[in-house]
């Protein structure tokens, strides 16, 4: 859906949250089912003029259907309605130690909420569903995992921490976020 039209629907939903289910149906009707193949910079790069908060997790590809089913079952029980669709994409396994696709074919599930609408309960619910399927959070999007919870999700996490300590022993390249996700590991 075109940015301006979707932005208008989101602002209306934020102003009158009880309209969100009807606005979502309108948005869904305006979207067309489509399938296409092209270079990733042409497929995944789109202008985003509607502001939102986002969380994204990578799950084993074989867990995708179950995770989406659980999310679809649980979201209607939230006190606050969700304004954005869920995004899904897939990728092949790789061998990059801290990649969300390390060692497994992966499906990515991204959730969003329009800026100014409550999102914490939705994101907490999402994280609990992702935890059930060994989901790995996108390093640059909202999540609450710390080193203690991230370590078991990445088979080479300890190796990475060792290399990090050797190459940056004084944490000159650190910040509060990196301390949270790397320094609390035991």
Regions of interest found by a model, annotated:
Residues 1-186:
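Noncatalytic alpha-helical scaffold of FAD-dependent oxidoreductases
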